[in-house]
């Protein structure tokens, strides 16, 4: 089987990671003790992608839980599926990273990283054929961002030919618990650009807006945001977890989605949007699902796809529905909105259908877009970064852990280059070959 090793780092990473395992265990018919109580062979056919089979027909998540303080992992352990994880795979420190990227990357995190890599090796060695790694983390704090990116680069060194996939939560002033989030996020993106193959940008700004505007929650909690994240993560991993033809492993997904190696930041979307614990009264039709899925209000990144163009798109429909209708609707969207898809990648929209819907829904659709509009997210963080950096505010916390100001300057310019690259391909047409090779000549768009 083609296995994936899952790593969750930091408070946010552990919380969305724990939710992810709750949701997919439920979908695969696995209870909190790891026993199977399902009703369909489809649930077990590719169970080995995410679970190890242990003695007594127990299924154990191939998950590694990492943090620099014990608190969050204690609450995962005492949570609904806390007992399903392998106890040896909890790796934690005591000091905390204090929302400081440098502590996670260079000091505290660097001390813990080898014990994490031991567990990574152990899990990888017991795999039949490892396809790659997925990391859940946030970019705003210290551990998920600093130590998360340290782990990525160490794993990259040791497993250069395996796919590295991240679910990265982007910070937003609307749900902020730290002033230095733009610093942590910028130096993290600097790492992700170079060291990951696929990054799902899960943007707190967008999650907050969905809860507030669409779900009419006046004071959204992290629990509400994480409900949306787990629905999205379940959706984008459907093709990996259930039998099917399209994007059935991480590498095939990357080949379909990433036309240029640096431009691997995806905008996820989901339909229908529901709040926690709510039941759906009426199943949506395929046209409604398709229309909602492409709507900017359903995007998990606070970017408007209409401000950019799609390089590539993958769509996953779940539930019992007519394949013919799905194909018609997807063509319909492309024909009506052809100006929003780059014309120099023909057939750049791929669709998969999986029979098993998520819990509580008759059918759902998940959207993965590689859109040039994602530059709006990077611009937002870059502006916040620059505002503080030009005054050198809070820098002493980072230089005190041995970081150099140059690192900040480099990260800033790398992010601005990324924005320019997206802009360059947004403006590119099919007939002007040879004018842009690799580098965008303009400084900043």
Curated annotation (Swiss-Prot):
Assembly: Dimer of alpha and beta chains. A typical microtubule is a hollow water-filled tube with an outer diameter of 25 nm and an inner diameter of 15 nM. Alpha-beta heterodimers associate head-to-tail to form protofilaments running lengthwise along the microtubule wall with the beta-tubulin subunit facing the microtubule plus end conferring a structural polarity. Microtubules usually have 13 protofilaments but different protofilament numbers can be found in some organisms and specialized cells.
Keywords: Cytoplasm, Cytoskeleton, GTP-binding, Isopeptide bond, Magnesium, Metal-binding, Microtubule, Nucleotide-binding
Protein name from the UniProt record: Tubulin beta-1 chain
Domain notes: The MREI motif is common among all beta-tubulin isoforms and may be critical for tubulin autoregulation.
Tissue: Highly expressed in skeletal muscle.
Gene Ontology BP annotations: microtubule cytoskeleton organization; mitotic cell cycle; neuron migration
Positions bound to Mg(2+): 69
Entry function: Tubulin is the major constituent of microtubules, a cylinder consisting of laterally associated linear protofilaments composed of alpha- and beta-tubulin heterodimers. Microtubules grow by the addition of GTP-tubulin dimers to the microtubule end, where a stabilizing cap forms. Below the cap, tubulin dimers are in GDP-bound state, owing to GTPase activity of alpha-tubulin.
Motif MREI motif, residue range(s) on this chain: 1-4
Family per similarity comment: Belongs to the tubulin family.
Pfam family, one: Tubulin
Composition bias type Acidic residues, residue spans: 429-445
Cofactor(s) needed: Mg(2+)
GO molecular function (one): metal ion binding
SS bond partners: none
Record-listed 5-glutamyl polyglutamate modification sites: 438
Protein's UniProt keywords contain Translocase: no
Keyword presence, Metal-binding: yes
């Amino acid at each position: 089987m083609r296995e994936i090793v899952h790593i969750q780092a930091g408070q946010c990473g552990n919380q969305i990671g724990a939710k992810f395992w709750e949701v997919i265990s439920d979908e695969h018919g696995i209870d909190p003790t790891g026993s199977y109580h399902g009703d369909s062979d489809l649930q077990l056919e590719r169970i080995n992608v995410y679970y190890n089979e242990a003695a007594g027909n127990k299924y154990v998540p191939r998950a590694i839980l990492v943090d620099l303080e014990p608190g969050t992992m204690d609450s995962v352990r005492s949570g609904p599926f806390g007992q399903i994880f392998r106890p040896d795979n909890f790796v934690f420190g005591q000091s905390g990273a204090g929302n400081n990227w440098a502590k996670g990357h260079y000091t505290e995190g660097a001390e813990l990283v080898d014990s994490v890599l031991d567990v990574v090796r152990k899990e990888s060695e017991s795999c039949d054929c490892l396809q790659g790694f997925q990391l859940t983390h946030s970019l705003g704090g210290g551990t998920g961002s600093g130590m998360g990116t340290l782990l990525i680069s160490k794993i990259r060194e040791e497993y250069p030919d395996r796919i590295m996939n991240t679910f990265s939560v982007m910070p937003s002033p609307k749900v902020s618990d730290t002033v230095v989030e733009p610093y942590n996020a910028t130096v993290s993106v600097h790492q992700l650009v170079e060291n990951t193959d696929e990054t799902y940008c899960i943007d707190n700004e967008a999650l907050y807006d969905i809860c507030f505007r669409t779900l009419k929650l006046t004071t959204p909690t992290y629990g509400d945001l994480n409900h949306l994240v787990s629905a999205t993560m379940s959706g984008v991993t459907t093709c990996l977890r259930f039998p099917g033809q399209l994007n059935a492993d991480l590498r095939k997904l990357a080949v379909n989605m990433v036309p240029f190696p640096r431009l691997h930041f995806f905008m996820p979307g989901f339909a229908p949007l529901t709040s926690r614990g709510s039941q759906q009264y009426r199943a949506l039709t395929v046209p409604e699902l398709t229309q909602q899925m492409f709507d900017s209000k359903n995007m998990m990144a606070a970017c408007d796809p209409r401000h950019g163009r799609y390089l590539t798109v993958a769509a996953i429909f779940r539930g019992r529905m007519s394949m013919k209708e799905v194909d018609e609707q997807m063509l319909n969207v492309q024909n009506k909105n052809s100006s929003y898809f780059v014309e120099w990648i023909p057939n750049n929209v791929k669709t998969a259908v999986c029979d098993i819907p998520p819990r509580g829904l008759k059918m759902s659709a998940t959207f993965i877009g590689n859109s040039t509009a994602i530059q709006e997210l990077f611009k937002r963080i870059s502006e916040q970064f620059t505002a503080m950096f030009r005054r050198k505010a809070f820098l002493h916390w980072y230089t005190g852990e041995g970081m150099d100001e140059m690192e900040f300057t480099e990260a800033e310019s790398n992010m601005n280059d990324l924005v320019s690259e997206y802009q360059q391909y947004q403006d590119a047409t099919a007939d002007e070959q040879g004018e842009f090779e690799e580098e965008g000549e303009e400084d900043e768009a």
